[in-house]
């Protein structure tokens, strides 16, 4: 679980600090910085575990100028995260300018590791690292083995943290038809930000899906079963099977399946099958009918996953407790963060005056 995030000089965040709980709904007018918060998590994950080499974490935005505050390339971007991993506290800091990582600090339980410039220090040991690589680039997991490129050994507990940090944090901008698009059979068993990879996850976990109550119940309620199909060119396609009253099977291709159903299925699999500890979603309400939104609120409240979600939907806001709302606004190009002060008093006031939380936020 992520408890705190501090952002300096990333996009519209000059010097901003978030405190997170179990459910966090981020609201604000267009252009206030909601998507920039999602981008911050996306950028950080790409920074510490690049998808390609040499690493270039700015590729989505073009270059460093387009991600640094006020496009001032003299400024360093930095992040600080406090959270909990397997019941133990951690603290992580990173600062960079362009492709040069200047500092990293990692504290996990009683262990500490520090990187200044290209030198990593742990206890009385040290080694050098290229300027453009995070310390976390040195750790990777293969089936049945964990490997790392250090010239000294680490305790198993710290090694586990270093290998898995942020791997169980999902950042999503789910595009339903991309989520269920065919993938090559060697595609990783993982979901990208658009949900792509869902077909591979389903293919590799069909039996587990039938044993995962929340996912199985959702499929049964919608009279749908899932059937992966391997094609001659090495791709995997997903067919959705619907049964008629006379038990005849109707094969539905993804284009014939509602986007809201696919989005809910993706979220359910991320929460209950992949067991992601934190799920970050931009515009969580998109494509979802009221029935699905109500179900999603229950998932946010009662699952083991933490949720950080942006929304424009009054309906989602009105399902929330005032303490779960994070309010953004922008002043002279800088995002400002506010939370409801004295949420219990506000709840009493809203109830007494017959005002919805979304109405209070709007007016």
Predicted segments, located by residue:
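C-terminal lobe/lid and adjacent interdomain/linker elements of RecA-like ASCE P-loop ATPase modules
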Residues: 220, 294-363
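Phosphate-binding glycine-rich loops of NTP-binding sites
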Residues: 20-62, 264-265, 270, 310
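Conserved ABC ATPase signature
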Residues: 227-291, 295
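Conserved P-loop NTP-binding catalytic core
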Residues: 38-101
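Catalytic acidic motif of RecA-like/P-loop NTPases
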Residues: 11, 24, 42, 258, ...
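Electropositive, glycine-dotted interaction segments
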Residues: 88-224
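N-terminal pre-Walker A segment at the start of P-loop NTPase domains
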Residues: 1-13
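Glycine-centered tight beta-turn/hairpin loop motif at sheet-sheet or coil-to-beta transitions
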Residues: 13, 84-89, 221-223, 233, ...
């Amino acid at each position: 679980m992520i408890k705190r995030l501090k952002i300096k000089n990333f996009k519209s965040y000059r010097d901003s600090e978030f405190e997170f709980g179990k459910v966090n709904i981020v609201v604000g007018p267009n252009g206030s910085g909601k998507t920039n918060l999602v981008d911050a998590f996306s950028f950080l994950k790409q920074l510490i575990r690049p998808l390609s080499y040499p690493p270039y974490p700015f590729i989505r935005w073009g270059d460093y100028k387009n991600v640094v505050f006020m496009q001032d390339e003299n400024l360093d971007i930095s992040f600080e995260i406090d959270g909990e991993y397997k019941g133990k506290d951690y603290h992580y800091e990173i600062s960079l300018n362009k492709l040069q990582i200047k500092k990293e600090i990692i504290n996990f339980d009683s262990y500490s590791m520090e990187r200044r410039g290209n030198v990593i220090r742990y206890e009385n040991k040290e080694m050098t690292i290229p300027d453009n690589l995070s310390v976390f680039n040195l750790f990777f997991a293969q089936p049945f083995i964990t490997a790392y490129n250090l010239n000294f050994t680490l305790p198993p507990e710290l090694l586990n943290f270093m290998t898995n940090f942020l791997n169980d944090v999902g950042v999503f901008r789910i595009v339903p038809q991309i989520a269920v698009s065919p993938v090559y059979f060697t595609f990783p068993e993982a979901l990208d930000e658009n949900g792509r990879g869902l077909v591979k996850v389903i293919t590799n976990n069909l039996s587990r899906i039938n044993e995962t109550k929340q996912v199985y119940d959702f499929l049964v309620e919608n009279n749908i079963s899932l059937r992966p199909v391997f094609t001659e060119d090495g791709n995997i396609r997903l067919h959705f099977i619907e049964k008629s009253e006379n038990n005849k099977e109707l094969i539905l291709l993804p284009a014939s399946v509602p986007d809201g159903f696919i989005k809910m299925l993706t979220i359910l699999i991320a929460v209950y099958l992949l067991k992601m500890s934190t799920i970050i979603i931009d515009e969580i309400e998109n494509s979802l009918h009221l029935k699905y939104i109500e179900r999603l609120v229950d998932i946010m409240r009662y699952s083991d996953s933490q949720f950080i979600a942006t929304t424009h939907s009054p309906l989602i806001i009105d399902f929330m407790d005032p303490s779960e709302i994070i309010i953004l606004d922008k002043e002279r190009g800088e995002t400002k963060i506010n939370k409801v002060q004295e949420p219990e008093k506000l709840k009493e006031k809203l109830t007494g005056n017959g005002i919805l939380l979304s109405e209070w936020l709007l007016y």
